[in-house]
C-alpha cells in the first residue's frame, strides 16, 4: 500500500516534524487509501466515461476559453504564489484547477516548473488541456476526483514525495454558480442538478422528493413557513 506525502508548502516543515514524532497528521493526502489494485480498478472503470465527456465537450460549439476563465476570479492569488514560492525545476499539484487562475499566476512567477492540474469537472479539464497547449512542457492535465488522484499520478509516472507543493481551493466556482445550465446556480433559473461532473450518476433531482425538500427547507432555513411545500412541488 502506498501513501503519497503531498503536503502544502506552508505546512511542510511542521508536518515533517509530526511524522517523525509519530503524531497523526491531517496534512497527508490521502488520509485513507485503498490498495493500489483497487485504485486502478476504480480509475480504469471511470476513465472511459470521463474521456467521452471531454470529447463531447470539445465537439460541442466553439468555446471562448478566455471568457470562460474570466468567469471565476481566484482568491488569495498573491498569497498562494508567495506561499508556494515556485522555483526553477520544481513540481506542483493543483488539485482544484477550476479556471486555472492560481496555476497561471504560479507560471507567471516561474515558468520553468511542472504543474499537474487535477479537476473532476470536464469543463475545467478542457480549460486545463487548452492551457497545456500554451505550456506543453509545464502543464499536465488530469480529469478525476480526489479519490482518483493516486491512480492518475501513478499512471503519469509520478513517484511518492515528488511534489514541492500542493494547492487545494475547495468549493464551487463562478463557472458552476453563474451558469444556469450546470444546475447549481442560486442566481439564475435552470435545471436542478448540482453535480460537478454531469455525465456521471443520476441527477440529484431524482433523489429530492417533495417531503425531503420540505424537510431541508425547515432544517436549513430554521423555519416552517406555509409555502415551503408549494415551493418544493414547483
Curated annotation (Swiss-Prot):
UniProt xrefs under Gene3D superfamilies: Putative methyltransferase TM0872, insert domain (1.10.150.170), Vaccinia Virus protein VP39 (3.40.50.150)
Cysteine disulfide partners in this protein: none
Keyword tags: Methyltransferase, S-adenosyl-L-methionine, Transferase
Role played: Probable S-adenosyl-L-methionine-dependent methyltransferase.
An annotated GO BP: rRNA base methylation
Protein name: Putative methyltransferase-like protein 15P1
Residues the entry annotates as binding S-adenosyl-L-methionine: 100-102, 119, 146, 169, 176
Organism: Homo sapiens
Xref: SUPFAM superfamilies: S-adenosyl-L-methionine-dependent methyltransferases
Top EC class of this enzyme: transferase
EC number: 2.1.1.-
One Pfam entry name: Methyltransf_5
InterPro entries in the record: RsmH (IPR002903), SAM-dep_MeTrfase_MraW_recog (IPR023397), SAM-dependent_MTases_sf (IPR029063)
